[in-house]
Amino acid sequence: GVGRSSLFGVWSVCFHTAKDRLAMAQYGKSEYWEERYTRDPEPFDWYQRWAGLKETFTEFAQPSHAILMLGCGNSRLSEEMYEEGYHSITNIDLCMTVIKAMQEKYRDKPGLTYKQMDGRSMELPDANFNVVIDKACLDSILCGEGSTHNAQKLLTEVARVLQPNGVYIAVSHGQPSYRLTYLQRPEFGWNVKTYTVQKPMMGMTASLSADDKDSVHYIYVCVKGEVAKDS
């Protein structure tokens, strides 16, 4: 209906029942996203806009860098970064519906490219990107069936496409006790630092969180090839 919260960019999912957990599991399914983007093509952003991420991102991502945006959806993040001089951003999403829409929307912005692709098996060369950005992609995979296996596949691919000393930046609602298990696996060789950013006011962004009590989102910055000496 007209009054649904999506019109205001708010997708707040807080569930505590078996039924709610079942609904949350849809986030791991490509059919869910195809249907959703067809039904509701208005842009929305999970968790944060560029304004909330800029301070941390600009420490690690330079305008000259080749950047990969995982699970881009119809987020405005790449557009907002483009306006600030980031002109080499490859955006991928499993959903062909949203990729076609974004290709059309940004056809006049060279360097802002959109490709239909599965992050768990990317058709991209090794060591191709300086920075990989993930805003809720890992989180949505962790909602679905086979979450641990699929998360491992995604992160293995991220490690593959990153250049030496490249940086994977994951914006998440998941606390370090739940996320570092995945990110600090020795085979990735990542030095992981955790940052926090205050959650924006309701209505500005969307939440994918199962338990949204925290007042912050977490930004996990994973630097390839810089393993801590004591790890």
What name fits each language-model region?
Residues W11-A51:
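N-terminal, positively charged/glycine-rich alpha-helical extensions of SAM-dependent methyltransferases
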Residues D45-H65, R76, E80:
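Conserved alpha-helix/loop element of class I SAM-dependent methyltransferases that forms part
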Residues A66-M122:
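Class I SAM-dependent methyltransferase SAM/SAH-binding core
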Residues R120-V132:
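A short acidic, Gly/Pro-enriched loop at the edge of an enzyme's catalytic core
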Residues N130-T148:
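A short SAM/SAH-binding and catalytic strip from SAM-dependent methyltransferases
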Residues T148-P164:
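A short glycine-rich, Lys/Arg-flanked "PGG" loop and its adjoining helix->strand segment in the class I
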Residues P164-S172:
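Conserved beta-strand signature within the Rossmann-like core of class I S-adenosyl-L-methionine
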Residues S177-S231:
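Class I S-adenosyl-L-methionine
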